[in-house]
């Protein structure tokens, strides 16, 4: 584990080549489909070039967290990700290799999860504000990543592909 931050999170660094079977067990190998880069090691064990790290991290936490007293546990990493994008483009949009910060929260119940989620969302808002980036937090489709709820921070740009509606009278 790495350094502890203001919301009690810890920085980690996970393998870029986890075993493919973790993604197969979760069903995400099928969901990602041809977006996955796969290969085999010298013993012919299938590996995946990680498009995300949920399976590997969940297996690690399952093996090492033995009590609710160890929770909440908030882990994050800034890591290079790889996806075989169907329409790669230049610049920072839709590239096959990109850096991403992902954060994961393990909590005792759904209420505690909501507290962790709100703290992380506020931490992101603070970072964007310090950088002078006028982002908008929007509801998002969790897609292949999965999950009950998902949000994205959008920075308005003419080169983007998404269209959003903004209500000037809403929060």
Where in this protein do the model-derived segments appear?
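Short, small-residue-biased leader/transition segments that mark boundaries at the very start
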Residues: 1-7
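TRNA-recognition modules of translation machinery and tRNA-sensing kinases, especially anticodon-binding
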Residues: 8-171
């Amino acid at each position: 584990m790495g350094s502890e931050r203001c919301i009690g999170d810890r920085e980690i660094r996970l393998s870029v080549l986890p075993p493919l079977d973790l993604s197969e067990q979760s069903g995400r190998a099928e969901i990602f489909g041809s977006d996955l880069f796969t290969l085999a090691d010298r013993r012919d064990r299938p590996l995946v070039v990680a498009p995300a790290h949920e399976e590997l991290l969940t297996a690690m936490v399952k093996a090492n967290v033995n009590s609710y007293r160890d929770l909440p546990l908030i882990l994050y990493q800034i890591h290079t990700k790889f996806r075989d994008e169907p329409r790669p483009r230049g610049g920072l949009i839709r590239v096959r290799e990109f850096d991403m910060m992902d954060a994961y929260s393990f909590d005792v119940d759904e209420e505690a999860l909501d507290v962790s989620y709100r703290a992380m969302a506020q931490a992101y808002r603070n970072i964007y504000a310090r950088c002078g980036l006028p982002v908008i937090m929007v509801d998002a489709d969790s897609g292949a990543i999965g999950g009950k709820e998902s949000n994205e921070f959008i920075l308005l740009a003419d080169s983007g592909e998404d269209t959003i509606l903004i209500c000037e009278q809403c929060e």
